[in-house]
Amino acid sequence: AVGATCVIKDLPGYLPMRNDARMNEMLRQNSNPLFGEENVFQGDHMTASTDMGDVSHLMPVIHPWVGCINGVLHSAEYEISVPDVAYIKTAQALAMTIVDLLYDDAVGAKDVLDNFTPALNKQSYIELLDNIAKGE
């Protein structure tokens, strides 16, 4: 109606998140006693983006979310509403998961690595980013 055009360009980075199922299960088992099983769940795909999505295409990772805030993410209204959960229980769950990965000569971490198939290798990741930046 106004004769305008619009060009949309993709920017490299922020690939979809690929949480490792084995590490997620370790974290779930460690979180249940701390938060209560009814408060721990596996989330579905989210529309939010993070550079951790890129990392997850190269190596096994998890990106847990803990519901202990009020307000909109990245806004002036964002605030911690349950400090014990934010600072203590979350750290405990993550620390217990690290122990599970490293205990007994890192048998848990070796299991995760042995069963992980990367979506990209270093070269294909760099090529993907270059192609996106070029508009291909």
PLM feature spans:
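Metal-dependent amide/peptide-bond hydrolase catalytic core
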Residues: 1-136
